[in-house]
């Protein structure tokens, strides 16, 4: 009996040792599974700046994708950090309205296509450090999703802001369109429409039941576990709840933790350590466009001041041209202007044309005037 127990113990120890040394399933899909995988981190938002539409948009990830193809990593880690202006950890916490995002679904769809399809031959995971609002739809476009222990995976309650209309039938059509498009991102990650609707529409409830090991999402309160029974708020998840319900595959507070969860025991992080992955590209971009936006606000203030003086029409024109140039160089600058004050590139071009006509006619004064804040 003792010999049998000893033999079983030895077999168990050998099995565990083999499992510990076995390569990750992701590593087995590499061109050379025997090689330690080279990792490449792509931030979606960084160091507290993660506005959808500006910090996170297609234009910068086109540059990142090109770099990925040159560096040829074996694993891409998408790192989501987008708070949608919610600086507090409670749902009704302090909001920074200037940092609220407004998703351009076409831009976001092209961005996800670029990252998932054009780079689809490389293993990918989504690692959420924080996700509030529309960034959650983007994060859930990836089936392999992990979170940090204090991460939020909050819903998209602001959808309701964009469907307001006095005609209920128009609201119904707008709402169906918005939620349908947003749920398209979730479908790409393999998540059910019931989840997406509950994360966008406050009146929708959400519960889950289990069919064996399979989780069944329900758009009612009759499931085994009630996720969201409040008809006044959308469904929000913290990391622990998301893990318990299978929304995220595990909790990792560092890249090292994440790699262990993925089954890797060794990896090549030289790109990360040498600042050669997407972190530098995205970080430089965020810094540059935000500087350009700050300078454009100064230039627009100069335009408003000079345009009222017939003798300074040329100075007004030069100031406004700087705003135009910033918008052309960084679509994020135009996005921010449109979000905050309704000023688009088309409007700036129109104002420049008006200044040109006034200069020709010799008239002046009463220039473009101010734009109302939002």
Question: What are the language-model segments listed below?
Answer:
Residues 19-130, 134-137, 141-143, 147-150, ...:
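Terminal-region recognition feature
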Residues 159-281:
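Charged, glycine-interspersed solvent-exposed loop segments at helix/strand-loop junctions
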Residues 8-17:
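Bacterial N-terminal signal peptides
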Residues 1-8:
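Bacterial N-terminal signal peptides that target proteins for export
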